[in-house]
Amino acid sequence: MLKRCILAENRKLHASPIWAMFFVLPILSATYGTFNYLQNLEILTDGWYSLWTQHTLFYSMLFFPAMVATYAAYLWRLEHLGHNWNLIMASPVPPLDLFAAKFAVVIKLALLTHGFVFALFVFCGKVFAHMPGLPPVTLPLFLLRGLLGALAVIAAQLVLAMVIRSFAVPIFLGLLGGITGIFISYKGHGLLWPYSLMQLGMNSNRSADALAGSYGLFAASCLGWLVVFFLLAHLLLRRCDVRA
């Protein structure tokens, strides 16, 4: 049943307007990051690493939470129309399978987004910043860490989009979560807030490794928040029928 749900969710992406956002926002982020790097060459002297900090700063803080929030809101949009929610609750599909299917599809979109962001990073580094060689192998590692941290953001936004009928409100809350994550990370408590995990994983706006000596805690926090949001989704779907 889960496989069928995933196939059904994937069909929603065919000719979807979210693909325009998929391309536009990473390009905007890369443009801003490259411009900021080129304007501060006297300060940003660490080559590929310095360019990475500029590319990932606003991507991890604003653009990615907004994109994930939009993905999640779009996938729940059909269920919130008319009486579709009642039909879903009366169907033989386990409600948590529906949530898990949307989670899998947003992960796929996040993976594609991360890949596109990294391709833009390499392109801008070679073409505009004239970087020598290829990016250090640690930068793709940061990208993978960011994807692990993004799982909590994805689950959080799916829960918000599930319980809030408005399309715009979950997106605003995603942006707010990302901005809040910056301040919480600055205070040294980033592992305690789900929206900080992706920023820490990406090592955004930092020259030193933000997770040095904390990989275990980072993985535990990512898993813990993921479990929390899945349990919350299960309880809401089971007890409240999430009336929108």
What kind of region is each of these model predictions?
Residues 35-52, 171-244:
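Terminal transmembrane helical anchor/hairpin motif
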Residues 75-107:
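Helix-loop-helix units of permease transmembrane domains in multi-pass membrane transporters
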